[in-house]
Amino acid sequence: MILTMKSSPILNRWPLAALALALTAGMSGAATTLYSLKTDGRDIPDNDSSGVASVLTLSTGGKLIGSLEVGLDIAGGWNSDYYAYLHHNRGVGSVMVVLLNRPGVSVEVPNGAESTGMGIILADTAPQDIHSGIPMNNGNVVAGRYQPDGRTVDPLSVTATSPRTTFLTDFNGATADGDWTLFIADQGGGEVGQLTSWSLNMTFVTVPEPSAALSVLLALGVGLGRRRR
């Protein structure tokens, strides 16, 4: 599998190092592949909605996504200030999934989570979404597995009760090939954070080997023949 880098217009002056690590699981030919991009601690401009974008360009030979998890590493800043999304052109229209939308912000707690930095995995199978489940007052780096925020409302008006309308399963069935764009912005004043790295952990749709498919068809044929007797 080939991993190439493409500079975004926002980061075209920053050299990025890309690392592709393939992990193969031997169950029925299924494979999970981790694509990781290290951004060398690029600043996320404080209180600036223009943010920064980082792009991974993948070439998998047309493989289709069966499931997707996203790793996100951010150093510093206030976690409740961050807004982030993942965008991909899936071949039949583009998909955008909101990963962060000012975690912890609610009507009761308008300033959101008082923690700095995170090293998390975002997965639809996690117990809680990051907005509602983030630790509120520990002041430490947040770690663990969370569902993506999914709230597409304006970051300046989002609350915990805003509807979640985007999920990582929205990418399922799409080709993995092409540009994957991570956008992140700091929507509040305070401290400058850095995007350290991010990753895509994909399981691809398994296509049966021709010999396996033939064996299944032969087995079905034998079964039908026995019924007719």
Spans of features found by a protein language model:
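Bacterial Sec-dependent signal peptides at the C-terminal "C-region" and cleavage site
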Residues: 27-30, 225
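Bacterial N-terminal signal peptides
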Residues: 17-26, 221
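Low-complexity intrinsically disordered segments
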Residues: 1-2, 21, 29
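Loop and turn regions of beta-sandwich accessory domains that flank beta-strands and are enriched
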Residues: 31-206
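A short, hydrophobic C-terminal helix/tail in secreted or cell-surface proteins
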Residues: 208-226
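Protease-domain processing segments flanking chymotrypsin-fold serine proteases, especially trypsin-like
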Residues: 1-4, 54
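Sec-dependent signal peptide recognition
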Residues: 12-18, 211-215
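Bacterial N-terminal signal peptides that target proteins for export
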Residues: 4-16, 229
